[in-house]
Amino acid sequence: MLKKIFSNGFTQKQKKMNKYLILTVIIFNLLSCNSENKNNTVFIQGGGTLNDWANLSKYAESNKELIDDLDENRVVFMGNSITEGWSNFNPDFFINNPFVNRGISGQTTPQMLIRFKPDVINLKPTAVVILAGINDIAGNTGPIKIENIAENIFSMSEIALANNIEVFICSVLPAKAFPWSPSIKNVSKKVIELNLLLKDYCLENNIQYVDYHSVMDDGNGGLKVPEHTTENDLVHPNKDGYKVMEGVILNFLAFK
């Protein structure tokens, strides 16, 4: 009987010690992960890192230079990879004009909203061209309703207007699918839905609506292949696609 009692008591004590041991291991692992994140950059979809979700650091140094060299005709292009890639296909479009490219690949509207002040407002431009929303539809930083995407763009617009900056809101370019997010369905319909919200907002608030969509649509909701994009891409313009966009936006900015 004594042996049985001792055995049972030892087992219960051992179980209790095991629980403490497991808890200690879990806490140690969590602390190790936090320490590792401090030393190693962890990149996230949407163009940032865990330590800089909106990628505020990308243009920080360049912004300092522009603040010290203000241009009363400056126009900032705010956007994602479609805007950022513009400078790669035709750098002269920005070099030969008072245009500043503030596109960041992969970004969504909440990320842009966070960096809107340092990357746009602080540069004191006369106007801002906002092209955003396609990565939100792709779910780059998680699911989001179409109306919430639009509201983020409206917020950027209202911040600009409050700072006496003229606003040009661009339609989202046509797209039928996302090669990096093939599970997203009805892409072209979602693009059209977002564009309708943007267009209505512009009409109601006397803001210029820049319609890239209608001139680049292949008739089935996608970019024209091979005229404006490649069959392996379907989302980003090629050189000729950017030329079309330049012709459209310059009609709005000619008076600047």
Question: Over which residues does each language-model region extend?
Answer:
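Active-site segments of SGNH/GDSL-like serine hydrolases
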Residues: 131-137, 158-191
